[in-house]
Amino acid sequence: MARKTPIERYRNIGISAHIDAGKTTTSERILFYTGVTHKLGEVHDGAATTDWMEQEQERGITITSSAVTCFWKGMDLSRPEHRINIIDTPGHVDFTIEVERSMRVLDGACMVYCAVGGVQPQSETVWRQANKHKVPRLAFVNKMDRTGANFFKVVEQMKLRLQANPVPVVIPIGAEDNFAGVVDLIKMKAIYWDDASQGMKFEYKDIPADLLDTANEWREKMVESAAEASEELMNKYLESGELSEAEIIAGLRQRTIATEIQPMLCGSAFKNKGVQRMLDAVLDFLPSPVDIPDVVGESESGEPLTRKADDNEHFSALAFKLMSDPFVGQLTFVRVYSGVLTKGETVYNSTSGRKERIGRIVQMSANERNEIEEIRAGDIAACIGLKEVTTGETLCSIDHPIILERMVFPEPVISVAIEPKTKSDQEKMGLALSRLAQEDPSFRVRTDEETNQTIISGMGELHLEIIVDRMKREFNVEANVGAPQVAYREAIKKPVEVEGKFVKQSGGKGQYGHVWIKMEPNEPGKGYEFIDQIKGGTVPREFIPAVDKGLRETIPSGVLAGFPVVDVKVTLFDGSYHDVDSNENAFKMAASMAFKDGMRKADPVLLEPIMAVEVETPEDYMGDVMGDLSSRRGVIQGMDDLVGGGKAIRAEVPLSEMFGYATTVRSLTQGRATYSMEFKHYAEAPRNVAEAIINKK
């Protein structure tokens, strides 16, 4: 089966934005203009195609990244057909993990900003993630029809807040109620869309006289940006003062893919204006799978390997998302980097070392699925029938294994105890939770050994609320949820050397294990590190793994209040053994005893999670908000002015002080402030706080 669309005409893009920038409405319009949906779904009515989980439709926010495939021939239908795979990513800070995982498989992104709200804190988080993965992107300023809309202010904000380099390729004609269309700076024509056809039809007209100077000024900036792409273009521009349409597009494309600039467009998705021109920009400026560097991985023995985006290469793909579907069971979304995969084939999961058979392959268009025979390099699709695959694992051909770089998922910072309302639901709840944990790696489930309660952990209160909600809807399990608990940690402050000796003589074979270890603080975020420095066989080789195991088993419960110990380096440097009585268990016990003793002597401290909090508030309430944050042991980091008045206050606050903050901030500001928070780092808890926690235990 030949490829319908050449890979050069593929675009794998994400649409990413702050919560209310109108991202889902923008995605909807894309699907409407590309002919995937025939009726426009509005988030306002809770009927958007890409928001297909019930909670998303109720809450009007997007939680999971749906992957949708559509085709576009250009606004004037004059181009060859391009295939666009869109991943709609959530904007809420509790779902940052979803953004992170979709950035990994995208080739380009379209950032949607609100013309009134501008660049908001969540946009900065997403921007940082896109920088980290070097994702080329363009910006779309939406909601130009709203009161207070200001396109040029958002351009300035992108420079200030994101250190971006935005290059407008269109500018708006009018704003607010008078927003009529856009000026295309490449063609130097005004574009007006026809309301009766819901924006399907449009016409080019001359630029309104009062906008001509502004248009010329911005066109010059754009042409200069394009000319900087190469010496050849720069020389031509300096000689003639002009570049052709094709040269401008080529220059801007080259610099966008190199992440040096971000082309900028604007419109109003709700009023059916501007999204069509943005789709053209996706074709013009964002890369196809061939335009970006080859994907990098390693062989099973650790040598670096690359794979070209080519059907003739060996097959490699990344499973970037799992979803349980009521009709077909588990859907595994994969991004194919190289080669071809046909349904019914067996592939190799190089991360886990298991073989998997692909049952069926489906292409998703939001919530409809079309079965297909095969997927090729550059495709994004969902596979059915993969039992053992989890998020972030590599699938590849059996004969030519490659392990692509794994995704790194953040540790959860908040936990709650959960129990089913009826005893009969216990088993169902276990099943539901393990299925949800498989889908979402930033969500964890464990059983507390002391209380036998089921504990679920995640990235924030909203994250866990939605998990409990999904359990009820998708698995019919009603649950009671306890008060949120903070994930504290323990660490040591000074190096110590300690010995652990485990000797047991009670008739028959005895037990003997003896170790000397040095414990010292490790760099923050390094975790546990074990170093073997045994010389002259004082601890025999075969028992050294047992020492490491004994330490690992002791680490999950520290000496202060039983919290996991982090960032500790342990060096085994001496010990002794008995020819007959020494065994693995004895050395495991000796290591565990030494570790506990060392913890007590090494100035143990309690660490608490600190959150980066950003509150956007009208100026009148600024003092109250700052006072309240300080009373929560918050440290104010700085303040920014917001577009359209108001302040954004940035602070670092311990998570334990942030429970129920939503209610407080609402009453302090009469509901006019919004806030977001994300995990920043662990820090030592003050003595009085630590004592209270230890005494509670």
Curated annotation (Swiss-Prot):
Keyword terms, alphabetized: Cytoplasm, Elongation factor, GTP-binding, Nucleotide-binding, Protein biosynthesis
GO molecular function: GTP binding; GTPase activity; guanosine tetraphosphate binding; translation elongation factor activity
CDD domains noted in UniProt: EF-G (cd01886), EFG_III (cd16262), EFG_mtEFG1_IV (cd01434), EFG_mtEFG_C (cd03713), EFG_mtEFG_II (cd04088)
Domain tr-type G: 8-290
GO BP annotations listed: ribosome disassembly
Binding residue positions for GTP: 17-24, 88-92, 142-145
Tagged with keyword Cytoplasm: yes
Family: Belongs to the TRAFAC class translation factor GTPase superfamily. Classic translation factor GTPase family. EF-G/EF-2 subfamily.
HAMAP family: EF_G_EF_2_B (MF_00054_B)
Protein name (record): Elongation factor G
Organism expressing this protein natively: Methylobacillus flagellatus (strain ATCC 51484 / DSM 6875 / VKM B-1610 / KT)
